[in-house]
């Protein structure tokens, strides 16, 4: 049986949390009307991306009342969205939550914080320190927030832990021109999505935002890619759009039988080499 999922390719307002909460209710209602069991929002969809000194003003703890409307909306379909988390030790994190049946069931803190070019994540936020899978409406899932997905270890770790669904919330600006005239960022992201989907035999839900902040345009192009590398659905570039597609757990099983790369992966060799590089002892005991 297939599972209908949705991506809310939206344009959050910078620093306007209450306005963005209202926007979320609209998109969640649209996803519900479309029959989706899960709707994924982009990175920092509750706050906007280029926050800089505003980050501390919009940060919330996981039990903050501002997140209650998201929890309430998740009673009949799962919701994943991004916000600035203020941790118990007062650190600020770029976070993506996953709510189901009225409860926050998982939070991923962005691990890789780009601080180069037009990006300033590392100046205002602390990094996460783990990649953990969790049960979702579409199967066992992992979250890679934007830059996380540009490090191949991220989806590899999720797939090794049993993930069949990779959620990729993003706030990716449109940059560069690829050969043939396509947007350079789009070409890179699409190549990455297809590679991870096909070689890790899982579904990729890439949820990118649109709109403008500080003269930077976010390009959208959200997409759903199947574990055989085929495109399920893709949103237009630069325009808001509710993208809806089907996830088929049986296809994951068929592809993993046909293309058993994960079955044959030698995690012990990977671990031994990493341990050696870090100067750690590694002794595998069968």
Regions found by a protein language model. Name each.
Residues 62-80, 146, 150-242:
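CN hydrolase (nitrilase-like) catalytic-core segments centered on the catalytic cysteine
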């Amino acid at each position: 049986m297939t599972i209908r999922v949705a991506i809310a390719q939206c344009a959050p307002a910078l620093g306007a949390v209450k306005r963005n909460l209202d926007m979320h209710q609209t998109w969640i209602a649209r996803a519900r009307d479309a029959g989706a069991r899960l709707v994924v929002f982009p990175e920092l969809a509750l706050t906007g991306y280029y926050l800089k000194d505003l980050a501390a003003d919009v940060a919330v703890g996981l039990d903050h009342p501002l997140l209650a409307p998201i929890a309430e909306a998740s009673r009949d379909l799962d919701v994943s969205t991004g916000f600035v988390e203020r941790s118990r030790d007062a650190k600020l994190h770029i976070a993506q939550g996953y709510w189901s049946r009225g409860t926050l069931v998982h939070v991923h803190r962005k691990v890789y914080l780009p601080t180069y070019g037009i990006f300033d994540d590392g100046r205002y936020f602390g990094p996460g320190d783990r990649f953990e899978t969790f049960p979702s409406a579409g199967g066992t899932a992992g979250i890679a927030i934007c830059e996380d997905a540009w490090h191949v270890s991220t989806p590899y770790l999720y797939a090794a832990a049993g993930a069949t669904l990779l959620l990729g919330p993003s706030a990716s600006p449109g940059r560069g021109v690829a050969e043939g005239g396509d947007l350079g960022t789009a070409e890179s992201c699409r190549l990455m999505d297809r590679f991870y989907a096909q070689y890790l035999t899982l579904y990729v839900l890439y949820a990118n935002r649109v709109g403008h902040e500080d003269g930077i345009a976010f390009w959208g192009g959200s997409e759903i890619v199947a574990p055989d590398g085929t495109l399920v659905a893709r949103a237009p570039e630069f325009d808001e759009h509710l993208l809806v597609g089907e996830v088929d757990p049986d296809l994951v099983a068929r592809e993993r039988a046909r293309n058993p790369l994960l079955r044959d992966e030698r995690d012990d060799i990977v671990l031994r080499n990493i341990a050696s590089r870090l100067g750690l002892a590694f002794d595998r005991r069968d």
